[in-house]
From Swiss-Prot:
Claim: Cell wall biogenesis/degradation is one of the keywords in the record: no
Organism lineage: Bacteria, Pseudomonadati, Pseudomonadota, Gammaproteobacteria, Enterobacterales
Organism: Enterobacter sp. (strain 638)
Stated name of the protein: Sigma factor-binding protein Crl
Main location: cytoplasm
Coiled-coil stretches noted in the UniProt entry, renumbered to this chain: 90-113
Function: Binds to the sigma-S subunit of RNA polymerase, activating expression of sigma-S-regulated genes. Stimulates RNA polymerase holoenzyme formation and may bind to several other sigma factors, such as sigma-70 and sigma-32.
BP term (GO), one: positive regulation of DNA-templated transcription
Amino acid sequence: MTLPSGHPKSRLIKKFMALGPYIREEQCEENRFFFDCLAVCVNVQPAPEEREFWGWWMEMEAEEKRFTYTYHFGLFNKAGHWQATTIKDKEVVERLEQTLRGFHEKARALLETFELKLEPADDFTNEKLKLSA
């Protein structure tokens, strides 16, 4: 499949995979890409498959000259689903912001090699952390 920019989707997925354990290929569809990060374990006592994590997820959409994004902070629950939620622990929030910024910088630099920009989606009004310069 070719994206609106003319680049093959499979090539971009391979490049995104090289950024680290962020892309969830099975949740990508058409021109949309899904990334997430399980940054902080809520409680290490349960068995690994029962653990919950604080983290973030980002959706990117390919357009002709840019990728747009939205992201959310929240809880990755025992059922394996994301729930948007307010996180009160300042250290957890700082860790999430750090990992999100790091991913954003890597993704932005990668897309620049394809002469594409990475910008907030036009309808993304809940940007808690400014990522674009």
